[in-house]
Amino acid sequence: MFKKILSALCALPRTLRCTPHPKLIMTLLVKNEEELLAHNLEFHHAMGVDGFIITDNNSTDGTPHIIERYRKRGWVLHVINETATDYNQKRWVDRMVMLAKNQYGADWVINADADEFWYSPNNNLKTELCTTHANVLQCAIRN
């Protein structure tokens, strides 16, 4: 019995174990977000996000140029130019999460919209994540 429990504990996802320096990736699904996107990337990078994976769904404004600017800085790790018109948000977000985990080694993934800003009272999201053994967190939303 002890061996089964030990085996199960060893098989737990990395995120259930306390990770002293977690890798935090944010995924963004955007379309025509030139007004907010740079602010979002700057804010979350300052809050400890290590990198961004962005799916751009047929933007016709300056959004692709902003994405490219931050890709050149090394902040945007991966860009998916989604040309489909069916807006399959679940599939697209799941794809970004799997990339974050499998290709970029994310311990934590935050999915957000360009108008969502994730805040930590100590100004570092990773510090908050280091204190938990959970693999999913619930956060308060304020408008």
Q: Where do the model's predicted regions map?
A:
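N-proximal low-complexity "stem/linker" segments adjacent to membrane-targeting elements
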Residues: 1-42
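Short, acidic, metal-binding catalytic loop of nucleotide-sugar glycosyltransferases
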Residues: 42-51
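Alpha-helix termination/capping residues and helix-transition junctions
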Residues: 46, 102-103, 111, 131
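Active-site-proximal specificity loops/subdomain of glycosyltransferases
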Residues: 64-109
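Short beta-strand-to-loop acidic/aromatic patch adjacent to the donor-nucleotide binding site
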Residues: 105-119
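Conserved donor-nucleotide/metal-binding helix-loop-beta segment in metal-dependent transferases, i.e.
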Residues: 120-143
